[in-house]
Amino acid sequence: METALLLAKLPEAYQIFDPLVDVLPLIPLFFLLLAFVWQASVGFK
């Protein structure tokens, strides 16, 4: 249990990457949106 809590919190050295880790799960949504916009631009062929 303690190991999981230790791994869940980023070490101090990686604290600067904390905002990046918050954004990473959103990247697949951006790809989905990009695919939709691309299909809309070519007319859903």
Curated annotation (Swiss-Prot):
It is a single-pass membrane protein. It comes from the Bacteria. Keywords: Membrane, Photosynthesis, Photosystem II, Reaction center, Thylakoid, Transmembrane, Transmembrane helix. One of its GO terms (cellular component) is photosystem II reaction center. Residues 1-8 form a propeptide. Its main location: membrane. InterPro entries: PSII_PsbK, PSII_PsbK_sf. It is found in: Cellular thylakoid membrane. GO terms for biological process: photosynthesis. Pfam families: PsbK (PF02533). Belongs to the PsbK family. One of the components of the core complex of photosystem II (PSII). PSII is a light-driven water:plastoquinone oxidoreductase that uses light energy to abstract electrons from H(2)O, generating O(2) and a proton gradient subsequently used for ATP formation. It consists of a core antenna complex that captures photons, and an electron transfer chain that converts photonic excitation into a charge separation. This is Photosystem II reaction center protein K.
